[in-house]
C-alpha cells in the first residue's frame, strides 16, 4: 500500500470516527413527547437526566415540575396537558 493510499485511509477513518462520536453525543430521541408542564418554579431542582439516553426503557428526559427527570412520554401533547396522569412517578 502506498503512502498516499494509507493517508486517504487514515483520514477516512478519522472522519467516520468523528461523525459517530457526534451522533452519540447528541443521543437518539425516544418516541413520544414530553407532557405539558404548567408549574411555575422559583428554583429548579437538580437534573436527574440530561438526554433521553439517561432514562431507562421508554422514559424520556423532560423538564417537568421544576427539573429535568425521566418520565413516561405521551403520544401527543393535549391542550392543557395531561391532568389525569402522574407521569413523574418511577
From Swiss-Prot:
Annotated GO molecular function terms are: serine-type endopeptidase inhibitor activity
Q: Where is the signal peptide?
A: 1-23
Q: Which key words tag this protein in UniProt?
A: Antibiotic, Antimicrobial, Disulfide bond, Protease inhibitor, Secreted, Serine protease inhibitor, Signal
Q: What is its main location?
A: secreted
Concerning SUPFAM superfamilies, the annotation shows:
Elafin-like
Q: List the disulfide bonds.
A: 34-62, 41-66, 49-61, 55-70
User: Where does the UniProt annotation locate this protein?
Assistant: Secreted
Mind telling me what this protein is named? WAP four-disulfide core domain protein 12
Question: Which stretches make up the WAP domain?
Answer: 27-74
Lineage, top-rank taxon, reads Eukaryota
So what does this one do? Antibacterial protein. Putative acid-stable proteinase inhibitor.
* PROSITE patterns noted in UniProt: WAP (PS51390)
Q: Does the keyword Cytoplasm apply?
A: no
Q: Which GO terms describe its biological process?
A: antibacterial humoral response; innate immune response
Q: Which organism is it from?
A: Pongo abelii
State the GO CC annotations. extracellular space
